[in-house]
From Swiss-Prot:
Binds specifically to voltage-gated sodium channels (Nav), thereby delaying their inactivation during signal transduction. It strongly stimulates mammalian cardiac muscle contraction. Paralyzes the shore crab (C.maenas) by tetanic contractions after intramuscular injection. GO terms for cellular component: extracellular region. It comes from Anthopleura elegantissima. Disulfide bonds join C4-C44, C6-C34, C27-C45. GO terms for molecular function: sodium channel regulator activity; toxin activity. The keyword Secreted applies. This is Delta-actitoxin-Ael1a. Its main location: secreted. It is found in: Secreted. Keywords: Cardiotoxin, Disulfide bond, Ion channel impairing toxin, Neurotoxin, Secreted, Toxin, Voltage-gated sodium channel impairing toxin. Belongs to the sea anemone sodium channel inhibitory toxin family. Type I subfamily. The keyword Disulfide bond applies. Gene3D superfamilies: Anthopleurin-A.
Length: 47
């Protein structure tokens, strides 16, 4: 999957670890949405 920025990672992608994975069809079982706003397409999820 494509890494994405969770809310807990910090405000921007610069210098922060991207701990989430981008899922287009929603978070799979056992994962949760870790970004309150965005991304525009898909969901940023982490285990």
């Amino acid at each position: 999957g494509v890494p994405c920025l969770c809310d807990s990672d910090g405000p921007s992608v610069r210098g922060n670890t991207l701990s989430g994975i981008l899922w287009l069809a929603g978070c799979p079982s056992g994962w949760h949405n870790c970004k309150a706003h965005g991304p525009t397409i898909g969901w940023c999820c982490k285990q």
